[in-house]
Amino acid sequence: MSTATISPSQIGRGARPDGEGSVQVQMETGAKIGNAKVFAIYGKGGIGKSTTSSNLSVAFSKLGKRVLQIGCDPKHDSTFTLTKRMVPTVIDVLETVNFHPEELRVEDFVFEGTNGVMCVEAGGPPAGTGCGGYVVGQTVKLLKEHHLLEETDVVVFDVLGDVVCGGFAAPLQHADRALIVTANDFDSIFAANRIVQAIGAKAKNYNVRLGGIIANRSDATDQIDKFNERIGMRSLARIPALDVIRKSRLKKATLFEMEESPEVLAVQAEYLQLAQRLWDGVDPLYCEPLKDRDIFDLLGYD
């Protein structure tokens, strides 16, 4: 993976490889992840992407699939409910060998979590330095070099919340479907619209396509439904606003490890249904995102 700065004289009017024309990460070619089904989870910061990703990963594993979850946020907290700890990141372990990846062992950066889900935290450079996209690229490269992706059925990328260049876009190079986690409120739907726009732009260069919305912390979905109908989106699942979900995070556990109750069993069933639906395959969506003013006018009550 390399970076490139393109001077104005080099910029033509035709199509350019992704990353050209600005200071961005140019993605490697031929970086497809084996035969695994790959999902990238997006959404507004704090919306519950890591909770959603971890429970979805366990749901896939309950279906008998071999699952790998890759946390792509410098906070490196994507997998702690699976591993019960904050595991070392790829950047952490690369630093210990002076960035000589050939000296790393699999057990240095891949950790087994709940029900056999394999977990990796890409980590990231310190705030204001480096490129998150480079870190994700190095993580996938390491996994391929150690042949870990050859024995994986499902890969789940849990992506940082902000729409930025490298860190946001890197998982899209590898993903088959991008899923957006949102709640039934203005701020998270507004962010979802921006993410739809960004993914649509990246889909011109990658094979990734929108898969749909996962409604999280949502007892109702009236605003999400308005948004979906307007842009041609669909909802794949609805996770209600349950206190047991908050408690599961505090217990460093997934919902599949919580004491059984009617509401726990219901939300487990929702995740299992979602995993099965995604495994069976969802048709790609080609949505038309709204302008900021239009979404402002669309949402809310008269």
UniProtKB/Swiss-Prot annotation:
Chain positions recorded as ATP binding sites: G46, I47, G48, K49, S50, T51, K75, N216, R217, P240, A241, L242
InterPro entries according to UniProt: NifH/chlL_CS (IPR030655), NifH/frxC (IPR000392), P-loop_NTPase (IPR027417), Protochlorophyllide_ATP-bd (IPR005971)
Gene Ontology molecular function, alphabetical: 4 iron, 4 sulfur cluster binding; ATP binding; metal ion binding; oxidoreductase activity, acting on iron-sulfur proteins as donors; oxidoreductase activity, acting on the CH-CH group of donors, iron-sulfur protein as acceptor
Cofactor: [4Fe-4S] cluster
Main EC class the enzyme belongs to: oxidoreductase
UniProt keyword list: 4Fe-4S, ATP-binding, Bacteriochlorophyll biosynthesis, Chlorophyll biosynthesis, Iron, Iron-sulfur, Magnesium, Metal-binding, Nucleotide-binding, Oxidoreductase, Photosynthesis
EC number: 1.3.7.7
Catalytic activity: chlorophyllide a + oxidized 2[4Fe-4S]-[ferredoxin] + 2 ADP + 2 phosphate = protochlorophyllide a + reduced 2[4Fe-4S]-[ferredoxin] + 2 ATP + 2 H2O
Co-factor binding details: Binds 1 [4Fe-4S] cluster per dimer.
Gene Ontology annotations of biological process type: light-independent bacteriochlorophyll biosynthetic process; photosynthesis, dark reaction
Comp. bias intervals (Polar residues): 1-10
Pathway terms, separated by semicolons: Porphyrin-containing compound metabolism; bacteriochlorophyll biosynthesis (light-independent)
Entry binding sites for [4Fe-4S] cluster: C131, C165
Residues involved in Mg(2+) binding: S50
The keyword Cell inner membrane appears for this protein: no
Cross-referenced Pfam families: Fer4_NifH
Stretches the record annotates as Disordered: 1-21
Subunit structure comment from the entry: Homodimer. Protochlorophyllide reductase is composed of three subunits; BchL, BchN and BchB.
Its biological purpose: Component of the dark-operative protochlorophyllide reductase (DPOR) that uses Mg-ATP and reduced ferredoxin to reduce ring D of protochlorophyllide (Pchlide) to form chlorophyllide a (Chlide). This reaction is light-independent. The L component serves as a unique electron donor to the NB-component of the complex, and binds Mg-ATP.
PANTHER family: LIGHT-INDEPENDENT PROTOCHLOROPHYLLIDE REDUCTASE IRON-SULFUR ATP-BINDING PROTEIN
Similarity comment: Belongs to the NifH/BchL/ChlL family.
Name of the protein this chain belongs to: Light-independent protochlorophyllide reductase iron-sulfur ATP-binding protein
Organism: Rubrivivax gelatinosus (strain NBRC 100245 / IL144)
Gene: bchL
